[in-house]
Amino acid sequence: MAFQGCDCFGLLVWLLLLQTRLGKARMVPGTPSLSPLPSENGLDDSGVNPQERPLTGMPETSLPRKPGDSTRPLDSMAFTPGQSFSTMSLSRQPFPTWVPPTSACGHRTARIVGGRPAPARKWPWQVSLQVHKQHICGGSLISKWWVITAAHCVYGHLDYAVFMGDADLWSKRPVRIPVQDIIVHQDFSMMRTVVHDIALVLLAFPVNYSVNIQPVCIPEKSFLVQPGTLCWVTGWGKVLEQGRSSRILQEIELNIIRHEKCNQILKDIMGNIFTLVQEGGVCGYNEKGGDACQGDSGGPLVCEFNKTWVQVGIVSWGLGCGRIGYPGVYTEVSYYRDWIIKELSRASCWKLSGFLVLSVCLVLHLAIVVAL
């Protein structure tokens, strides 16, 4: 019996050593691209259709304010930035290694009604991050397992779920998937301005793509959307600064402003000497005053390049809602591509490591039984 126990102990040591090596693995070099990306040459302006109902304003912010400014600080966060936490103990399906969306990302199969796409299928990557079936923030689907949103949308260990597949929040037909895990950028902060406002949401089980549900493309790190490019932001946020959130998904067309110019505009408005829009941010502006508002946070800012829709930004913050001359600020997705790949790869490694720990525990249990 001692001899048999020794064999099991040797196997246990071998598995532990293997787990340690795999736990240190970071599969970034071998991780495939998230999606085929548009080249920087030959970018054509999107032939998008006219907006249906304009959004106004931006999410709340904790930035310093001029006297009389109606912008209110965001609610305090209740999580540790940079850490992943489980919101539900779910294991309905085995977690796969990271598999990027197919080359079909960034395309939509909208029905044409009156010469333009119907809302139900116009933005198939748009999701609603919800708690107890109440809309909290927007987000966008980047693969069958993952959603991308803003870090300031995460309030702690709540029972989050993701709503997708319909433009109507009251619809009884949508897909609603519980959230298994959320990864917040480790350097997210709202101390002086909002920085690194990005988070990844892991679904409890993979979504099935359909005409109503499709992933959006994520740009390469080197991709920079040019100033003046026409893009679209979507969400279920407020349609007026002092109004209510919308039941139907809204959209508005914006012109891109690079972070350097946007920073100067906002500094001039606020009389502030601090850098408000840092590298990793990008801005959008509509001359008529429409943009995103409270409730739109975390949602996508997308642009069409070569007939493919690419997410260039995540709704982050702004001053008030729909004010003429006030651009809205977005997290620039291309700047965080390496972080996205790293975290998705790390999640895959962690799951594999967890499987090995379970295997070791089972082997140890068998060794004890044999010894007895």
From Swiss-Prot:
Recorded GO MF terms: serine-type endopeptidase activity
Cysteine disulfide links: 137-153, 231-303, 262-283, 293-321
Extracellular topological domain: 26-351
Lineage: Eukaryota, Metazoa, Chordata, Craniata, Vertebrata
Segments for region (Disordered): 31-72
Key word NAD present: no
UniProt membrane topology term: Single-pass membrane protein
Alphabetical UniProt keywords: Cytoplasm, Disulfide bond, Glycoprotein, Hydrolase, Membrane, Protease, Serine protease, Signal, Transmembrane, Transmembrane helix
Segments passing through the bilayer: 352-372
Signal peptide: 1-25
Tissue: Testis-specific. Expressed by primary and secondary spermatocytes.
Name of the top EC class for this enzyme: hydrolase
BP terms from Gene Ontology: proteolysis
Family to which this protein belongs: Belongs to the peptidase S1 family.
GO cellular component terms given for this protein: cytoplasm; membrane
Cellular localisation: Membrane; Cytoplasm
Main location: membrane
Function in brief: Lacks protease activity in vitro.
Name by which UniProt lists this protein: Serine protease 44
Enzyme Commission (EC) number: 3.4.21.-
Entries under InterPro entries matching the protein: Peptidase_S1_PA, Peptidase_S1_PA_chymotrypsin, Peptidase_S1A, Trypsin_dom, TRYPSIN_HIS, TRYPSIN_SER
Glycosylation sites: 208
